[in-house]
Amino acid sequence: MINEPLYFLPGENGFKGQILDDFLASGYYRMQHLIFTTNHTTLEPGKESIPVFWLRTEVKKIRENKAALAIRKKCLSFTVTCKKAEITTELEELYRLYKNHVDFSASATCWDYLHLDEFDNPYDSRMIEVRDGNCLIAAGFFDFGKNAIAGILN
């Protein structure tokens, strides 16, 4: 296949700090404990390849519009916590609900999406939890570099 993906395994220092920033700036993306880039992908095996567009957002330039402010107001009763990433039974149940409602292929578990058993996590991974009272209603994972972050699973 033309333009097959290019993968890198983690080195001794993993993909943290400036190393992650450099890969992100070059169009690389995390897949489990590897990092890869590609210019084309397919949605189904044997089907025509389509171009990939890697998007980056300068967070400092984001401005909330009226719709975003209205949504934020409706969500004031929710609690939002940012912490070191961890996969719990509660999170796996939320992922299972998500997986049952999407019409594309997804990993069997949240753990499977984010990790490989062969390596320790080479990223400085964090998570955001959103709760309605004690109930986990949303979660997102991201990796820290030195100056950049990469959203992984939301």
Report the location of each language-model feature.
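Acyl-donor-binding surface of acyltransferase catalytic domains
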Residues: 1-79
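A conserved beta-strand-loop-helix scaffold within acyl/acetyltransferase catalytic domains
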Residues: 34-41, 63, 70-154
